């Protein structure tokens, strides 16, 4: 049995793995102790072929294991991580994003730490988004905590909620601070969410300015669904307030993030002559169309055309929705993923 497993989920991120995977293996080349587990989450960009052509020698050595699932249509962060963690054989499991470089000696450092200490989990200092998701813990602790919460959809908060749940279970958070463990591939934010449901199904985004801190967001999806709500920028509102020194507490609190003010409503929309109708459960809203705007007597929604701004809005909205879900939860692991987690069909090392 391996001592530590580095767990990588990948959906159409071939160009990142081509840069990071082999280097991470060579920088942590402990064949008897280490395994890298790649879960190909139904990629369509040639990942399977590249692994077969360029990485087979590492599979034959036993330091690399390749799994593929053909079921997902969209990338689901919590579900994919739960799958790959369950497939890992190491006593310690570590989430590793496809764009991360581990750094030379990361595996050896973690093995020493987990051999000398009990009931801990390791994270980054949580100051850098690109390394935020890296977490190492004993596999048994992951299973007992019931994994990442699969109620979260889209970008953000699945790792924060998981870390907080580990703390509530009595585990101690440790932080790796070595700068060589923080190197990443830089890339556009769109690549973080390009394979996720919300961005793929999005048809258009409209903004209704309220004040410097609040904006009403209307998102129209393909298939006639919509979402609408007020996003409040607490980061700007609390700009002059002192920061929370504990980064995890800062992430859990609403003082330093975008939040939904009130509730996020969803429903079905349909086109009308010169406008659209938003159908809620017990009401409807009619918006007229004029010069890339939708309006009624009280609101004027401007259509967002800039692709980069759309990505920023999608990331902010999904994180705010997930935060709203998290605030309604308790930290009882029994209520997390009650019907199981990380479920699905996979194929190991091309054994179809």
Q: Which role fits each region the language model picked out?
A:
Residues 32-45, 67-70:
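Short beta-strand/loop segment that forms part of the nucleotide-sugar
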Residues 108-134:
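Conserved donor NDP-sugar-binding/catalytic core segment of glycosyltransferases
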Residues 93:
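Short aromatic/hydrophobic "clamp" motif used to bind/position activated sugar donors
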Residues 13-28:
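Short, well-formed alpha-helical segments that are part of the catalytic scaffolds
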Residues 46, 100-113:
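Acidic donor-binding/catalytic loop of UDP-sugar-dependent glycosyltransferases
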Residues 167-352:
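C-terminal catalytic/acceptor-binding lobe
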Residues 38-51, 97-101:
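A conserved acidic beta->alpha catalytic loop
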Residues 71-88:
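Glycine-rich, basic loop-to-helix element that forms the pyrophosphate-binding segment
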């Amino acid at each position: 049995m391996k001592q530590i497993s580095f767990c990588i989920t990948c959906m159409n991120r071939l160009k990142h793995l081509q840069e990071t995977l082999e280097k991470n293996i060579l920088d942590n080349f402990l064949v008897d102790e280490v395994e890298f587990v790649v879960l190909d989450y139904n990629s369509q960009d040639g990942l399977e072929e590249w692994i077969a052509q360029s990485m087979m020698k590492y599979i034959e050595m036993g330091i690399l294991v390749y799994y593929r699932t053909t079921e997902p249509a969209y990338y689901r962060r919590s579900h994919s991580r739960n799958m790959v963690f369950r497939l890992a054989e190491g006593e310690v499991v570590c989430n590793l994003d496809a764009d991360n470089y581990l750094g030379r000696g990361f595996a050896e450092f973690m093995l020493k730490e987990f051999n000398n200490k009990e009931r801990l989990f390791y994270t980054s200092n949580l100051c850098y988004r690109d390394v935020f998701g890296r977490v190492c813990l004993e596999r048994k602790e992951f299973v007992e905590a019931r994994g990442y919460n699969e109620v979260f959809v889209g970008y953000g908060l699945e790792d924060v909620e998981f870390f907080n749940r580990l703390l509530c279970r009595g585990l101690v958070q440790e932080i790796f601070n070595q700068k060589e463990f923080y190197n990443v591939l830089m890339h556009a934010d769109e690549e973080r969410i390009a394979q996720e449901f919300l961005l793929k199904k999005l048809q258009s985004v409209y903004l209704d300015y309220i004040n410097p801190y609040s904006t009403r967001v209307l998102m129209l999806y393909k298939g006639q669904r919509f979402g609408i709500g007020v996003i409040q920028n607490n980061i700007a509102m609390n700009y002059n307030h002192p920061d929370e020194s504990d980064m995890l507490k800062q992430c859990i609190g609403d003082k330093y993030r975008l939040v939904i003010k009130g509730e996020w409503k969803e429903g079905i929309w349909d086109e009308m002559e010169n406008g659209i109708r938003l159908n809620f459960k017990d009401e409807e809203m009619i918006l007229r169309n004029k010069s890339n705007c939708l309006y009624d007597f009280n609101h004027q929604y401007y259509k967002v055309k800039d692709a980069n701004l759309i990505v920023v809005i999608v990331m902010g909205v999904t994180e705010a929705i997930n935060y709203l879900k998290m605030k309604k939860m308790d930290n009882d692991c029994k209520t997390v993923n009650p019907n199981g987690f990380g479920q699905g069909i996979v194929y190991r090392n091309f054994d179809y």
